[in-house]
Amino acid sequence: MASFEQMRANVGKLLRGIDRYNPENLATLERYVETQAKENAYDLEANLAVLKLYQFNPAFFQTTVTAQVLLKALTNLPHTDFTLCKCMIDQAHQEDRPIRQILYLGDLLETCHFQSFWQALDENLDLIDGVTGFEDSVRKFICHVVGITYQHIDRWLLAEMLGDLSEPQLRVWMSKYGWIESENGKIFVCNQEENIKPKNIVEKIDFDSVSGIMASSQ
């Protein structure tokens, strides 16, 4: 199978041309989705084109490919890719087992039920077979949420939220985000007050602008 970069240029031409929604291109686009999953790469535009082709050609619908598209969208949280993809899947197919489970996982992530997410994922690890880097991509999203929510967080809680990480694994993520261990098992995330940057808005109004308004109001 060609690499992601090799396929990207060819797929880009397909998406720009009049054949964007030609069902004969589905096989190429589906292989591209599989390549994204294997190589931890991502192309939202191409993946949305796949889902649109499934809408236009229901007989060609592939549950496995759709599941991979959804999983790749989850790796790009907090962007709204997952919601976009979900809206393009009809209700009947949303009830298919892998798709239903992935939608549930997405709901847990979007509502920040992180411990429940890892528990549900552990019970359905087959869902992410062939999706390289999925768990670490989710951890990046969780760290993003922690970074904008907490000043201090219990060490045990952070480890749980990141999927019951071991001590060395947790230290890697703390180092990545510059989080420092403080006393009593707490981790210093950041000073939220320093993140609030008020803006002073100064608007200059010259006399000509005011005189025009005054004249029109008379």
Curated annotation (Swiss-Prot):
Entry's Gene Ontology molecular function annotations: ribosome binding; RNA binding; translation initiation factor activity
Record key words, sorted: Cytoplasm, Initiation factor, Nucleus, Protein biosynthesis
UniProt signal peptide: none
Pfam families, A to Z: CSN8_PSD8_EIF3K
Keyword Protein biosynthesis: yes
UniProt record, GO biological process: formation of cytoplasmic translation initiation complex; regulation of translational initiation; translational initiation
InterPro entries for this protein: ARM-type_fold, CSN8_PSD8_EIF3K, eIF3k, PCI_dom, Transl_init_fac_sub12_N_euk, WH-like_DNA-bd_sf, WH_DNA-bd_sf
HAMAP family: eIF3k
Subunit structure, interactors included: Component of the eukaryotic translation initiation factor 3 (eIF-3) complex, which is composed of 13 subunits: eif3a, eif3b, eif3c, eif3d, eif3e, eif3f, eif3g, eif3h, eif3i, eif3j, eif3k, eif3l and eif3m.
Name assigned to this protein: Eukaryotic translation initiation factor 3 subunit K
Species assigned in the record: Xenopus laevis (African clawed frog)
